[in-house]
Structure formats: C-alpha cells, structure tokens
C-alpha cells in the first residue's frame, strides 16, 4: 500500500490490476460489463429479499468490482469510492433497503442507457456509476459495513479465482 493511499484506494487499485491481468479493461466492452453489473445487482436484490446478510455483503462487493472495471473502461482514472458522501438521516425507517434497491435499479437503468447510446455521454455514465455506488454505500451502512469492508471481502474472494473471459465477461471456473 502506498503511503497516503486509503485502504479502499489500495483495494480499488488491486481490483483494477486484477481486471487488467484478465484483459477485462481492453479486451471487454462496457456493454459486456453492464451485463455483469446487472447480474451482480440482481444478486444484491435477491440477498435483500431473502435477508441473507452474507449474500448482501458479497453482492455489494461484487457490484463495486464491476463498477470499478466499467469506470476504468470508460477512461475514468480518478474514479474512487472514497469520493462518495451520502445522507444517512433517512435510513432509520423499516424496509428502507427495498426502497434503496429500487432507487439503485434506476441508476442501473441510466448506466445501461448511457452505455447503449451511440454517442456515449461518459461523464453522465460515470455520474450514474457513482450514484449506484452511493446506493451500495447506503445499503452497506444499514448493515453496519463500509464500502471498503465489502470491496476487501470481494477482492479477497476473487484474487486467486480461476476462470476465463467469454464475450468480454469474466466467468469463474465451475460456472
């Protein structure tokens, strides 16, 4: 870890290198990563519906990994979850996780839209990736985790994972 680097910055850098090593930045497309993003976010919604804490934490981390990869593909060298600040005042109401997940799905739709349009609006797409990560931060906060906790857990899960890239999407061995 570099001297002034936060723990989450360190793990974001490791995730970017992991993606480079597997040719997911240059050898994949934002469209392919968007499919992976939808998959991981769907797992998060499933975890919340089932109230499965382990799946929720894993899915937050996995979704962050894909967001970091997409931001790198789109050329955002400055993307960092450390830049997120969200309002925690309205988070003490019952069933708020479901409301937050639905709001995040709106951001997911916006990301999909900006990835799919002919003249990509990269800045708006990155803005929606940040907004989705902010949603993840809110859900993590409700479960008493930080985004860094979720990212570190996800990285430790994937760092030595074997697999292959199929049509620009990382498929772990055994899937």
Segments from the language model and where they lie:
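Flexible "arm" and connector segments at domain edges
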Residues: 1-175
